[in-house]
Curated annotation (Swiss-Prot):
Transmembrane parts of this sequence: none
Basic and acidic residues composition-biased segments: 338-363
Protein name: IQ and AAA domain-containing protein 1-like
Species: Rattus norvegicus (Rat)
GO molecular function: ATP binding; ATP hydrolysis activity
PROSITE patterns from the UniProt entry: IQ
Chain intervals with Basic residues compositional bias: 464-479
């Protein structure tokens, strides 16, 4: 597509953005219980609109060439992504669950389930920093050094005699198979000759033979024509893809080449822009800098004189933390500036006096909070209040910049998509002015001291820096003591790789986690039934909680803080695959703190503390990082089994929880735990540590259908070869089986030999059922046990309580209606 196409897409996106910003709820708006459904609908609509905007901005940022527009697009893209995460948090608070049934909203907005897909910004992988690339290269080098040692340990020596015996066995087996095939053919020929001798050969006349040949040939031709006509009809109505695969592949290849060429142009234009930035800054500093400096000095001197004339003394110069001389240039009179400075001094005195009264106030505030909470509990109408957004100011600023600068500016002046020199000079002029202001402030402070000595005979008074606003002591973080001050981070990184705590993740994308969405979620909700999440919902939640937050520092800062996720589900549901997908999509390090992997490493009394310190220190420096804890129930065991007491799986628990609490906004470190048996863990500790708990049930029919279809196609089988395969029957039969089971059965059936036979022997559903029957499914009792545990989590309890309240209210309403009818 051309640059004009992306420009029009950008303009259309801003038109939509303007409408969406008008629909935003006001912050701290109370949400009443009776308004819950309407508020849920509003938030759902906003969520879907912002998802669409995220998709458009992602495409525009990836393909637009002009460097200044791309900077604005990047801020908008991060702001919209942050808003999507905030709305997701609001939906969880309203729905009291991690699964949101938006099928009714999709239908009313005339959208499709594809619009529910969370787009992952492409720049997460394309614009990885040099630090991340160097770290990946360092990991590859360390693993390459370790591979020969591991292979030497694993390989067992073999004598010449043993090798000869193995070769002889293989050769004899080959000759035996060949001999058996030859004898089978001889027996077939003998059997055929025997039948001919017994029955006699049927004799045909020339005409009869011709008729038989014509019949067979005409039947063959007619079947081919009917098959071709059916194929054309199915392609015409869109039920089958076009048979011309080469045309489609050529179109995709051409589009890929076009995208890559635009990305190459982006790099070229960015280099030009960086050179222009340096030249413009230097030019403005040389040409306009001296005039700016003199003008500022004159203004400040005039302010000194006016203040002295009004008050009889020279003013206190604003310090740098307050803005310095910027306060003087903000269109204020000397009297106003003096009043502001005096007000600041009085406030500082008041704060010092109020320090002694803080304890009394805290007690009163606690009492007030208790009374408010009691009132809120007594008042069932108020559910919660809308939280203020950190992303909307960023989005508003970006939208205003687009409206004021780029909306009315066309690309006729710069068809080559080069930077706009006028806009660049305006931006750099402000920067140069700020730099010169700092220099002028230093000079004028000294001049003010000299004036006080010469005119008022005052000695220099030390300027007190304004004290920071006092916050609650509980909110302050204690600075963590560095237990490895004499070690470089690179050496610590290498040490963790060598002992196996840092591992290389497999290249798995989030789209490889196959699943379909829940189509009847709203229907189940209206029937007061709790819908189970589909595999599509799990993939979306991982994209929201894991990928978007770890991919960008700005998004992580704006989004609600989520430090840990727990994935609960039976074996074979792809929990570890999701962890690796997060690492692949964001380029994150993978730390393995599973109890089995930690066993025997950093022993001793303080070994656990040192281990957590090194892991989190390296994870923070080389962020983004994912800390995976497999079989996490062992870390939170209620009672450690006898056979696992040597492992001591709970030894890192306290230090792990302490280190996790130190993570804040901007620390792109995510802890992801996986478990199949959460019932063995202490419920309170597990739920307190993991902030988000995602339950992965057995796949439903829609997900199983997509799994069978996609997994078979991924084995190199085209759509035409699977026409005779009843995938719907396979999806029905495989109820209770996990994606891992389905993949095992497909790999068992589709061997190399079977793939070669597809042209003569099409696939049949019974082939897969035979192998599937050999595997143990997830029994209903196991899933019910996991559900019962999940409903005991804090969010699960709230959901159950809310559902029961709704059922009771519905029963009461029906009872009233019956009484009225009587």
């Amino acid at each position: 597509m051309s640059e004009g196409t992306y420009q029009r897409l950008w303009e259309a996106s801003h038109a939509t953005l303007e409408e969406v910003l008008e629909k935003e709820p006001s912050p701290l708006e109370p949400v009443l219980t009776r308004e819950r459904q309407s508020f849920q609908y509003r938030i759902s609509v906003l969520y879907l609109y912002y998802l669409g905007l995220l998709r458009r901005f992602n495409l525009a940022y990836d393909q637009m060439v002009q460097p200044q527009k791309r900077r604005l697009l990047r801020r908008l893209l991060d702001g919209v992504a942050g808003r999507v995460l905030e709305l997701k948090d609001e939906l969880v608070r309203v729905d009291l669950c991690e699964t949101h049934c938006l099928d009714r909203v999709l239908q009313e907005l005339k959208l499709t389930p594809v619009d529910l897909e969370v787009p992952i910004p492409k720049y997460f992988q394309l614009e990885q920093t040099s630090t991340m690339k160097a770290r990946q290269q360092m990991l590859a080098e360390i693993l390459a050094r370790l591979e020969p040692l591991a292979s030497q340990e694993n390989l067992r020596g073999m004598s010449r005699t043993e090798a000869l015996i193995i070769v002889q066995c293989a050769e004899r087996a080959r000759q035996g198979r060949l001999r058996a095939t030859f004898m089978r053919e001889i027996r077939k020929e003998e059997e055929r000759d025997r039948r001919i001798r017994e029955n006699g050969r049927q004799k045909f006349s020339q005409d009869q033979g011709a008729i038989v040949i014509q019949k067979v040939w005409k039947g063959y031709l007619q079947r081919k024509r009917i098959e071709q006509d059916r194929r054309m009809e199915m392609e015409f109505i869109g039920m089958l893809p076009s048979s011309s695969q080469t045309t489609r592949q050529n179109a995709l290849a051409q589009a890929f080449v076009g995208e890559e060429s635009r990305r190459t142009r982006q790099v070229e234009k960015e280099e030009e822009f960086q050179e222009a930035i340096a030249k413009t800054h230097e030019s403005l500093t040389e040409t306009e800098g001296p005039d700016m400096k003199e003008r500022m000095k004159d203004q400040i001197r005039q302010w000194f004189i006016e203040c002295h004339a009004l008050t009889g003394r020279f003013p206190d110069y604003p310090d740098e933390a307050s803005g310095g001389s910027y306060l003087i240039f903000a269109d204020k009179t000397p009297e106003q500036v003096r009043q502001e400075l005096e007000a600041q001094a009085q406030e500082n005195k008041k704060k010092e006096q109020e320090k002694n009264k803080d304890k009394v106030k805290e007690k009163k505030e606690k009492k007030k909070k208790k009374t408010k909470e009691e009132k809120a509990k007594k008042d069932p109408e108020v559910m919660f209040k809308v939280l203020p957004s950190k992303s909307i100011p960023v989005i508003n600023a970006g939208h205003e910049e687009f409206t004021s600068i780029w909306k009315s500016r066309y690309d006729n002046k710069h068809p080559s998509q080069s930077f706009d020199s006028e806009t660049l000079r305006e931006e750099k002029r402000k920067q140069v002015e700020m730099e010169i202001r700092v220099q002028v402030d230093e000079l004028m402070r000294q001049e003010l001291r000299n004036l006080r000595l010469a005119v008022d005979r005052e000695e220099t008074r030390p300027l007190k820096s304004p004290k920071k606003k006092g916050g609650k002591k509980s909110g302050k973080k204690k600075k963590e003591k560095d237990l490895t001050p004499d070690r470089s981070v690179d050496s610590l990184f290498e040490e963790l790789v060598v002992i196996g705590l840092i591992k290389k993740s497999l290249l798995v994308t989030l789209n490889d986690y196959i699943g379909d969405c829940l189509y009847l979620g709203s229907t189940l909700t209206l029937a007061n039934k709790i819908p189970m999440p589909s595999l599509f919902d799990i993939r979306q939640n991982i994209a929201l909680y894991g990928v978007l937050r770890l991919g960008s520092h700005d998004i992580h800062t704006m989004a609600p803080l989520v430090r840990s996720i727990l994935l609960v589900g039976p074996s074979g549901m792809g929990k570890k695959m999701l962890v690796q997908a997060v690492c692949t999509e964001t380029g994150a390090n993978l730390f393995d703190l599973s109890p089995g992997n930690v066993m025997g490493k950093y022993p001793g009394k303080n070994g656990s503390q040192l281990l957590m310190h090194i892991v989190f220190k390296v994870a923070r420096v080389f962020q983004p990082s994912v800390i995976w804890i497999g079989n996490t129930e062992k870390t939170f065991y209620k009672k450690i089994p006898k056979e696992e007491r040597r492992m001591d799986p709970k030894r890192i628990k306290k230090d792990l929880m302490r280190a996790t609490r130190q993570l804040g906004p901007g620390d792109r470190v995510m802890l992801i735990g996986t478990t199949e048996r959460p019932q063995l863990a202490e419920m309170k500790g597990l739920c307190r540590f993991y902030e988000r708990i995602l339950f992965i049930p057995r796949p439903d029919y829609a997900s199983r259908y997509v799994l069978w279809k996609r997994m078979i196609e991924n084995q190199g089988i085209g759509v035409q070869q699977t026409q005779s395969l009843d995938i719907s029957a396979l999806a029905r039969v495989s109820d209770g089986y996990t994606p891992g089971h389905i993949l095992q059965s497909i790999q068992s059936v589709l061997t190399e030999r079977r793939l070669l036979q597809l042209t003569k022997k099409p696939l049949v559903a019974s082939e897969f059922v035979v192998h599937l029957a050999k595997l143990d499914p997830v029994y209903r009792e196991e899933e019910e046990s996991l559900k019962e545990w999940f409903y005991k989590t804090p969010l699960g309890k709230k959901n159950i309580k809310f559902t029961k309240d709704q059922q009771e209210a519905e029963e009461a309403r029906l009872a009233k209606e019956k009484k009225k009818k009587k």
